[in-house]
Amino acid sequence: MSIGLFENVGNSLQFAFDNTAKKLLRWIGLSVVFYVPILQFLAIGIFMKVYRGEEPDFSNAGKSFIQGLLLFIAQLVYALIPCLIIILSALFSASESLGAITVVGLIVGIVLAVILGFIMIPMQVNFARKQSFGAAFDFNTIFGMIGKLGLAKFILAWLLYVLVIFAASIVIGLFSAIPVVGAVILMLYGSFCGLFAAKYFHNLFE
């Protein structure tokens, strides 16, 4: 990809701004569904449209809702294995004779959770672009995406993304103390971050 990491941040922030502050009604609508249980799947589906290079609007809302729901299910499947390992390890911790197994199990579970957390990013991009549930588990393509980008660049891009979100959260947190205004800003912040993240990783794996 020709675009650099820092340029990607600027490009993605501009994209999020253009599709929120410049399209206020869409921003409000997206923010509402983003925080409403069940309807949140629609917001996820709209973010997925960005992975495909589409406009993040409410057209084909039914399709976006289904795709958001399917992505949520895929994420649950990814999270299931490390969670089970950690839970079983915690249960075994009551037995002194299984102390070593418990420690190993916890370490394995945590490491696996971190690895799958990284994999989930290209998984979401692949799922959104192919619009197929099976694409979420097409590990040849998913690992190929990481390999094409380069593991080091992928990790750096992820760290930069986390840093940007962390910095933005601190700034937003300062405004959250303002009555009413703070609550509105917090509500709008989630959907803005969703659009930023979708565009950022769309560019990364373009």
Regions found by a protein language model. Name each.
Residues 51-57, 144:
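A cross-kingdom feature marking solvent-exposed beta-strand/loop segments within repeated
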